[in-house]
Each structure stands twice: as C-alpha cells, then as structure tokens.
Amino acid sequence: MNTASLSQAEFLRLVRLNPFNAAILERLPDLDVQQGHLVAGALFGTVWNVRSGQPPTAQIRDYDVFYWDDDVSYEAEDAVIRRAQALFGDLNVPIEVRNQARVHLWFNGKFGQDRPPLNSVREGIDQFLVTCTCVGISAHGAVHAPYGLDELASGILRPNPRNHTPGLCAAKIADYTRRWPWLRADGPVINQQRLA
C-alpha cells in the first residue's frame, strides 16, 4: 500500500485551516491545566477534509480537549469544564473536556468494557482505536503522533494493538469510511460492536 508523507509542520498547517482548531490551540494555554492537548477527530478529521476537498470544519462532530489532574473527582473535572466553557464558549462548537486520569471510572458505563487507568494524556492518545488517529497537539504546540503521520495522510486505517477495547474498532472504521469514503481499512478488524 502506498503512503503519502506528512511532516509535523504540514500537519500543524492543515489543522489550523480549521478556524476552531486554531482558536482552541491559541487559547488552550489559558485553560491552565496539566498536559492540555487538543486531540482526535478535530485534528485528523480536518486533515481528511482538506485532503478530500471538503471545508476544513466539515463532519467534525466535536473538539476534544484532554488534560491530566490527579484529583479524579467529578467536581474537579466539572470545574475545568466550566472554565473551558467560559474560554471557548464564543466558538459555538461542541468542546468535550476530559480529565484522562478519570477515564477508567466512567468508561465501562459508556462503552460496556473495562479499561485500565491511564498514566498520562499521551498514553490515552496512544490507545485510540485506529493508529493513524492517535494524534494530539499540546497547549504549547507540540505534536504527539506515536505512529507517525504518513498513514493519516494516506487514509490507511489500522486497528491499534495498544487499544484495550478492540471490539469497538470495526464500528469506528465504518464511521470514518462513511464520512470519508476514500479512506481504507488495513489489517484485521475485530468484532462489529457498535459505538455509543
């Protein structure tokens, strides 16, 4: 399978073509959280939109901001969510703010599967369902892409061997290929369990 190449500088340029990404990344340091990152669909979806000739904001369902706080109480996370609403509210797009130290506490209730506690935001990014979607940009502009960016540019969707919930992968890949038909799955896809 041929792959295109994508440098970190070009990735950042493409991501910032989405004005909501640009605004969130500009303001993210002001959220004043540890390990703050803009992650997931806001990033890879923007790249895929640009590569397929769609507007950069097309088909972006929400903008995920991850951070880390050893205080795993709901109240502490809710306080950060409220600060984020004040900081980003004028953008009028759904922004999901989640403390990655808490994921193991709610994951089973949402997805019906247990997962072990994470040790950092980047460990959470490293475990996304599909390897090329394991991307994040820190509050200081550093790109985190443990599998590189070339398969993201090429639209190659591979199940992530580091993910603890592989049964959700088939539904996620089906969703991506429905929204961006030029993408292609590669590697074994496990189970047809539906995402919530």
Where are each of the predicted segments found?
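Catalytic cores of the polymerase beta-like nucleotidyltransferase superfamily
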Residues: M1-A196
